[in-house]
Each structure stands twice: as structure tokens, then as C-alpha cells.
Amino acid sequence: MTDAIASVLDLLSLRPDRVARLKDVPWGNGNWLIETGGRRAVLRRYHPGATPEDLAYEHAVLGHLASAGWVVPHPIGDPVCREGLWYCLTRYVPGQPATPESPAQRRRRGRDLARLNLALRGLGQRLGQRPGWRPQHSAVAAYAGLDWGACVRQLTAVSPALGSWARAAADQTRAALAAIGASQLPITVIHGDFAEWNVHYRNGRLAGVIDFGLAHQDSRPYELAIARTYRAPETADAYRAELARSGWPLSELEEAAIRPVYQAFRLDMAAWELDHGLKTGDYDLTAIERQLSRTGTPPP
């Protein structure tokens, strides 16, 4: 256990029997399993850019779902701040992700994503947009704190070829979204990362959903993109079918937006790599090239 975690536990007046690191991503989130008297909880450390307003939004989403019977990592105490980083004790979510998924498991995840979106439907009317976020189809990056212009300028200084490619990809992505009228896409509160590793199952049944760090108002095509359904078509098909069965099918515009929004998602992934390089000076050029290659824009 690190000094930082020990200090946070003191702030929370916790004396656990056991502390185990689950995940600790530099410049990102961290999670530690806390066991006390046979009961489990998870101490979450939020990324350096998290603000009280940002966390309040995420916790409101979690509270809404928990009230509706979903097993999610909702807070079981107030957040505390140590050396500029926010921490919060949250509910432990049991089960394990199904990785790798079988076709049947992919279909199951698609149905569960549809059910989650149905549970969140209408919540945006009360919460509005998450502070600092916007729909993916409205900008290069869904996170408004990312300075795309500065990112591309610095990338160009490091790799002129990749900088030129990034600019071209941004132009082509904007054009593709404009061509289908993406500005008219309806938005709703989404999970924001319903990939297989964030969905827990136990004994063949859904046990819970974790990691709502990217939850915000966005389009359902973006939810499909960031759920990585491009490599799990069974998930997308089951998602469509469950929504249609529940009376909330994807519209023609949403169907038309799936491909260009996926390409916008890939550009956003590249933008995060650029942002990391801008902040640290460490550029993973291979990762940047890989993301740009998936935007549908060929290298210039």
C-alpha cells in the first residue's frame, strides 16, 4: 500500500483488513480493493483532470442506476481530495468480464447495453451535459479540455507526416458527419465505455457494470462505437433488436451515422494520444498511426 492510499484511508477513517491494487493507470484512474470485516468496497482515484462538478455528474448517473436496481460502483461516502487528486469509496461490483467473448456472449452484452440505455433514457433532461464534455459528432474530441490545435501543432513538430494526416482526418471526419446531418442526432446519457472488460457476469448472468468515467450525453451510434461493436457485430445486432423490441429503435439518421461516428471515435482516440504527448513529451507514434489508420482517411 502506497503512502498516498494510506493517507486517503486515514482521511476516510478506514482501518481495512486488506488492501489490494486492482488498477493504477498513470495519468488516469486507479482502483484498490478494500476489505473490512469480510465486506468489500473499492477505493477509486480519479484522473488528474477530475473536478467536483465532474464527479457530481458521474455520481448522479450511478445513483440513478443504483436506485433502479443496477449493480454499479456508486459512492458509499463523500469524495476526498489529497494533493490535488480526488478519491471516493465505492460499491464493490462482483463477477468478472467475459473475455474473450463467444458470439452468444457478445449478443448478451448487446442486450444488456440496450437495457442500460433504456434505464438512462430521459436522465439527460434532468442532468444536462457533463461539465467539460460534448457529443462526439460536434467536435474532434468529446472532452472539451483537449486542445486539438495545440496537439496537432506539437505532433507536426515531432512527425510532420503524422501531423498532416491528423489534419486531413479531422477535415474528412467533419465532412462525413456534415454530409449525413449529424448535428441533428439525438443525444442521451450513455455509459461511454461499455466494452467487454467493463461488464461483469457471474453464473451466466449480468452481475454489474463498472467504469462510468466517460458517461455523458452523446449519441447512440457513439455508444456503439466506444463499446467496440465494430469488432463484435453480434453485439450491435442484439442491441438494435432489444431497442426495437422495447419501442426505442435506432432512427434512419442514427443508422446512417454509425460509420462516420465510428471514424470520429477513432479520431478522438488519436487525439487522446496526441494530448498525452503534448503533456508529457512522450509520443507513441505507432499508436497514433494505428488510430489514424482507422479513421477512414488515407495518409497524405
Question: What positions do the PLM features span?
Answer:
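Active-site acidic catalytic loop and adjacent metal/ATP-binding pocket
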Residues: 27-38, 42-43, 75-77, 174-222
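A cross-family kinase active-site recognition segment
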Residues: 100-164, 187
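Short pocket-lining segment of the protein kinase catalytic domain that shapes the ATP-binding cleft
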Residues: 88-96
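Protein kinase glycine-rich loop
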Residues: 21-25
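Juxta-kinase regulatory segment immediately upstream of eukaryotic protein kinase catalytic domains
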Residues: 1-20
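ATP/Mg2+ or Mg2+-diphosphate-binding catalytic cores
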Residues: 142, 149-155, 164, 269-300
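A conserved alpha-helical element in kinase catalytic cores
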Residues: 44-85, 100-115
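Active-site activation/catalytic loop segments of kinase-like enzymes and analogous catalytic loops
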Residues: 220-248, 263-281, 290, 294
